[in-house]
């Protein structure tokens, strides 16, 4: 996000106590804003959006009925909650732009990976409450999970507001900021891990003779059903594996090969690598990708 112009589509007087400014109309910004409307915690007319790309923000506003503002600062001034949904590399310029407009009554919610609440507070230079959030890609279908943590000035009421707003795309959990990089490595990147395994499963099905579309359908529903066993059936992952694995059976042979191939170690190493990268980004204060 850079300082830039956008257009006002709705000039009606709005209650700034309930307006939410979403600065950054990229994929995740759109998903979160749409989730607020879908869950009923805000109407489309209470969502103010901006983006450095005029065409993109017009498309998003038109699709959902959001309000466009002429600048980031104007959106902040007309809102009590501000969601920072830009890439980490664009955050310093955005913070510098909006800092004069941010006051003690604002709640700032940032989804920028690798940017600490302390860095956000320094960049804003004021007394606003800051909450850091880590959603994931499954939020687009209302099945995400978002972890939030409070900055030094955020109170429980601020976390409650963040939970309410972000809850439209899935469950919200509160954690200490020390855990946020681990959350990034597990759930933030997690959909990609499962997708990679599913991709390999589909290819494997084709290898043993299934038509690709049949293999893809089998894998997708098997993933959905397995997730339901864990979330709705209250089974531990190890219990699911044990329940399916008969002594000397086909699943037992398959699990043996997966273990021989180092799948478990590969997962551990992958999550560690993601965690280390998240720490590297956080070490840069405002991060970059």
Where are these regions (language model features)?
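Rossmann-like NAD(P)(H) cofactor-binding subdomain of soluble oxidoreductases
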Residues: 48, 54-55, 64, 72-148, ...
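NAD(P)+-binding Rossmann beta1-loop-alpha1 motif at the extreme N-terminus of oxidoreductases
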Residues: 2-70, 74, 206-207
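Internal alpha-helical scaffold of NAD(P)-dependent oxidoreductase catalytic cores
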Residues: 119-129, 145-182, 195-232
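Small-residue helix-packing motif on alpha-helices
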Residues: 47, 57, 75, 120, ...
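NAD(P)-dependent Rossmann-like dehydrogenase/reductase catalytic/cofactor-binding core
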Residues: 5, 9-15, 220-289
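Short pre-catalytic strand/loop immediately N-terminal to key active-site residues, enriched for Gly-Thr
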Residues: 131, 180-185, 237-242
């Amino acid at each position: 996000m850079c300082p830039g112009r956008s257009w006002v589509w709705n000039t009606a007087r709005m209650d700034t106590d309930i307006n939410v400014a979403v600065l950054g109309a990229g994929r995740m910004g759109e998903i979160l804003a749409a989730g607020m409307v879908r869950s009923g915690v805000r109407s489309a007319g209470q969502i103010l959006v901006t983006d450095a790309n005029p065409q993109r923000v017009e498309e998003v506003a038109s699709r959902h009925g959001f309000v466009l503002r002429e600048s980031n600062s104007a959106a902040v001034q007309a809102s009590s909650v501000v969601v920072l949904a830009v890439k980490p590399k664009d955050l310093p310029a955005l913070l510098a732009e909006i800092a004069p407009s941010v006051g003690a009554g604002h709640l700032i919610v940032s989804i920028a990976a690798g940017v600490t609440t302390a860095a956000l507070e320094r960049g804003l230079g004021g007394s606003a409450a800051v909450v850091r959030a880590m959603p994931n890609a499954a939020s687009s279908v209302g099945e995400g999970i978002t972890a939030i943590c409070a900055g030094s000035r955020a109170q429980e009421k601020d976390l409650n507001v963040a939970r309410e707003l972000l809850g439209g795309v899935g469950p919200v959990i509160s954690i200490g900021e020390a855990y946020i990089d681990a959350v990034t490595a597990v759930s933030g990147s997690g959909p990609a891990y499962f997708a990679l395994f599913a991709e390999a499963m589909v290819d494997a099905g084709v290898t043993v003779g299934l038509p690709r579309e049949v293999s893809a359908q089998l894998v997708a529903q098997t993933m959905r059903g397995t997730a339901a066993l864990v979330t709705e059936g209250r089974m531990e992952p190890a219990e699911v594996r044990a329940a399916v694995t008969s002594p000397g059976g086909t699943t037992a042979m398959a699990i043996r090969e997966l273990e021989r191939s180092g799948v478990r170690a590969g997962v551990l190493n992958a999550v560690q690598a993601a965690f280390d990268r998240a720490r590297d980004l956080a070490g840069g204060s405002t991060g970059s990708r």
